Every structure is written in C-alpha cells, then in structure tokens.
Amino acid sequence: MFGWEFPPHILGGLGTASYGLTKGLCKQQDMEVTFVIPKPWGDEDKSFMKIIGASQVPIVYRDVNYDYVKDRIGNVMDPEEYYRLRDHIYADFSYMLTNDLGCIEFSGKYPDNLFEEINNYSIVAGVIARTENFDIIHAHDWLTYSAGIHAKQVSGKPLVVHVHATDFDRSRGNVNPQVYSTEKNGFDHADHIMCVSEATRRTVIEKYHQDPNKVTAVHNAVTPLDPEILAIPDKRGVKDKVITFLGRITMQKGPEFFVEAACKVLQHTKNVRFIMAGSGDMMDQMIRLVAKRGISDRFHFTGFMKGKEVYEIYKASDVYVMPSVSEPFGISPLEAMQCGVPSIISKQSGCAEILDYAVKVDYWDVDALADAMYALVSYPAMHHFLSEEGLKEVNSIKWEDVGIKIRAIYDQLLS
C-alpha cells in the first residue's frame, strides 16, 4: 500500500484516512498490510502493520556494514530489511542523486519539487515490488499513482487506486494539467478505482472518462477516540458560545463563507466567538476580511493544529462548521460529532451522503449557514438533540466495516 503521509505527521485528512483504513483492514486475521511512505519519522504506530520508508530503500548499491546501517536508519528500519531491499535493485540508477546508503532523500511533505519526489517515489516502488511478497497494490491519492503503476508493471499484481480527492475538488475547476494527467494515468492503469464518496465517483467517471463498472464509492469512517482524548476536559459552558471552522484555509474549504455568515450572526447576538483553526494560502485574506467586517474582537485565528490540539478545540466548541465548496469526504465533522459537537456541513461534501444528524446547507448560501449557526447557539433543545444523536451516529461508522468492503473488492480482483 502506497501513501504520502501517516500519523502523527499529517497535513490533512489523507493521513488520518490512511491510518483508519489500514487499521480497519488489519482487523481481519488473514490480512497483512505493508504501508510505504516517503519519509518515516520513527514514531508511527507499527503495532498492526509493517511500514517502509522510501527514504530508507536503496536504489544504488553501497557496500556498507551492518553497524553503520543500524546507526544511520535503525530508528526507522531493521538493517536486515535494508539489505533485503538492496538485493533487489533491478537497474542502474547511479545517475540519481543518492546518499551514503544509496537511498533517495524525501522531504515527507509537499515541497516545491513535488513532481520530482513523485517520480523518485515511483522508482523506489519498483525495488519494493521486487522485494515484498504481496497480492494487491493499493495506491492512495494522485501522489502515489505513479508508484502504484510501476509496482504493477514490475510485479504483474492488480492495482487499486484510492481517490481521496481530484484536482477538480482542490482547484474549484481551475485544474492543473500536470496533476490531471497524473490522475488520469493512474485511473487508466488501475484494475479498480475506489472513491471516498458517490460525488467523487461521478467526477472520476465523467471528468476522467472511466468505466463505471470499475469505480466504486467506499465512504470513510472515523477512528474511536483513545482514552487520552476522552480525558480532555470539556471547556464549553462559559458565557460566550464558540463556533469553529477547522481545516486548511484554502479556496476548496470555503473559509470566506464562514466569515460572512459569522458577520450575520453577530448582527443578532453578541455572545458568540468564532475560531478559524488551520493555515493556508487564504489565511491573510481572511484576517483582512474579518477586519474589514469589523468583527476582529470576536474572531480568533489559531494557526495550524494537529493531534491532541485539534480535540482541545472541539471540546471548547459549541458548533462545528465545514462550508467546503467541494469536499470529497470530510472526516473533521465526524471527529467533532465524536466530541458531542453539532456540525453544519455543506451539501457539497461527501460525508453529507452518510450523515443524517448534521445540518446541511449549500456552501454558497451564507444566509442559510448563518441561520443554522444562530439556531444551534440559541436553542438548547436543538443543540442537545443533534449532539446526542450525532454522537450515536458517528459511533456506528466504523473503519472495520470499510475494511470489509475493501476486502470484497480485493477478493473480486483476485478471483
């Protein structure tokens, strides 16, 4: 399985979904997953599967002794694994820039030379595919499709690509031709395509001209909260109500609609504060918009948050809002609902297909969004109902069930 990020080092929902999905799959006794990421940090959860870092896979032979390898990468990889991979280098990659172990360095992020890293990752995938014993190749999102294709060419094994988003979602239609080409190439080479929602499935079929018979919607789920998160004290109940937006502050997420709706709410009640948690290329623009609307004293920008910090924000919030213009799925409302926070989501989000106990509005309908915000902070009975029923609903949406659906697709491909 190829991915680009994995907890605790994540920049969005892709890593969170990768973790939940792999854990759900591994609940099946006869399922073993090897998960490949560009750069491991050593603190990933390896309790249920094997993790390989592309930055520890040699593509050029280096004659190095065991102790040296252990000293260099022993915190993230067993030296024996390094030698096993080294024995399966299949071509002369001496023209590539490699380090003292014959490995390519990866940033583990989304650098300016992203397409170069994607290409390098696909080279490493070939070595891994020649070394590992496996039945299926599963590639998460466009960044890993080239790696999946190369692994398929090397091994002859079936390729499943998992669409967490398309460039039509990320760009509001202003599609990057290079990204589109990478995505379409992945879809064309895939034996099956999984999409995180029916809306994404339709996009893949219509915009990328794929056979509907090989495209399936497999909705995401949510990971049960661990005791450390459950122990975070509930900070609601002070005088002011808190309404939160949490996510990348980018065009796709619709942050400007949150600000405009907040302005309308404050025309009717002053006992509300707004949090915009996250970072992104529209953050400065949103700070200026808040100042222009004269609501800076009611607005808080926290910057990027991760891990426990995210749940501390949920536990301090009365309402969660996700006004995304295009959201293939959207795990964050499910996480908020786990903390008993009623959620308002856009009808243009994939999670709207499976959630009954969330308020749904069109992303562009600022009046409807403001009405929903106002209602949830003004009517305790409505707030209590959605808090209780929403919690029950998300507790029934399990990654284990997603794993069973994915297993059925695997079995179909292998039969």
Residue ranges of each PLM-predicted region?
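Conserved donor-binding/catalytic core segment of Leloir-type glycosyltransferases
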Residues: 194, 237-262, 275, 387
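Conserved acidic donor-binding segment of nucleotide-sugar-dependent glycosyltransferases
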Residues: 358-367, 375-380
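A conserved catalytic-core segment of Leloir-type glycosyltransferases
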Residues: 31-129
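Aromatic "clamp/platform" in nucleotide-sugar-dependent glycosyltransferases that forms part
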Residues: 325
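Nucleotide-activated donor-binding/catalytic signature segment of Leloir-type glycosyltransferases, i.e.
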Residues: 285-305
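Short alpha-helical donor nucleotide-sugar binding micro-motif in glycosyltransferases
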Residues: 304-305, 312-317
